[in-house]
């Protein structure tokens, strides 16, 4: 673990060399979190809100929020039979039968449709029995001879041994079994919800991006840098999807709220430009603003460097490469080790006592889940996805049974850092307060064992591949 004296000494050198603030704060500025510039005698950060910041959730103890987003897994698929969590042994079918959930590899070559239409088929008016009707297909990355289609396929779960780092994190800290994907569709709109609490196409519009963006002959797109002719299907309040727009939007974002508060953000992604998972590229004022070229960072492994060198921003999103994504049909099984690498980097750094880490999955990926999601409108809420909460103040060995959604992560960030509300789904969401005990002393970090070291991910070639066979 790097010592504070190391950070301070480096900061002195940097302060001497630099006459003005760069796009990334100095090490001392960043280690002493940016809503504070000093620590009180108690060790709690003092902020512009006053000593110990009593108005903030956590009293100012949390000054960094990291949102790690993986891909396409339902709760029942990834945490089957997790102790004290609500999981199922059997799944219902549209034929009135039951299917015993069965183990399937994380690297299973078949992908399951997870469009909004597929949600409606599987949800089946609240019966939760249409999963056997979901379409599956073999990924183009796979040997077609390894694919065996079946209406049982969506009822699979990933064995614990394949995702052991996730189970270790969930066991040591908090696992939420009532975390619902806010939207009822695939990755592109889901990532918009994770930064804006909505996928509306403009501030005053009720139309929401509902599907992945595509262009004929160009595969998966998404964002203001999308190829000419790219469109995304939108959904109206009545549930109609009969209108397409270019996927470049004008609306609020958490990045904007962070900047307004004088704090910092970084969005780490595999590649720059358009992409299904590259959420900032689809928000016009971010894409064409001054911070895009400094705060949207590629490749995603730079987060490890920034943590190690004291350049962690106040709010951080971390998205994966295709191989490390957990996305069915295209991943290579390295996702759990990738997430653990980021968590371990924070845990071994001076940031640990001031950071909250949220690990979630952007959508359910078509996989079975037995819990009926609440329905607020024509596009919210979607099926359950896992949420792991990791922090020195996270409750130990705790399963949260309270209802959460993507807006809950946004609301937690607003309330811990003193940000203005987005006025979207964060308003109705809870703040994840049940997952923390801020009156307790910060826990020491315990390394998460992994099969792959961080150097494995840092040595991978930069790739601009999204799962453009998403369907």
Language model features with spans:
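N-terminal pro-sequences and low-complexity stem/linker regions of secreted or lumenal proteins
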Residues: 19-471
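C-terminal motif of bacterial Sec signal peptides marking the signal peptidase cleavage site
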Residues: 14-17
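Positively charged n-region of N-terminal signal peptides that target proteins for export
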Residues: 1-4
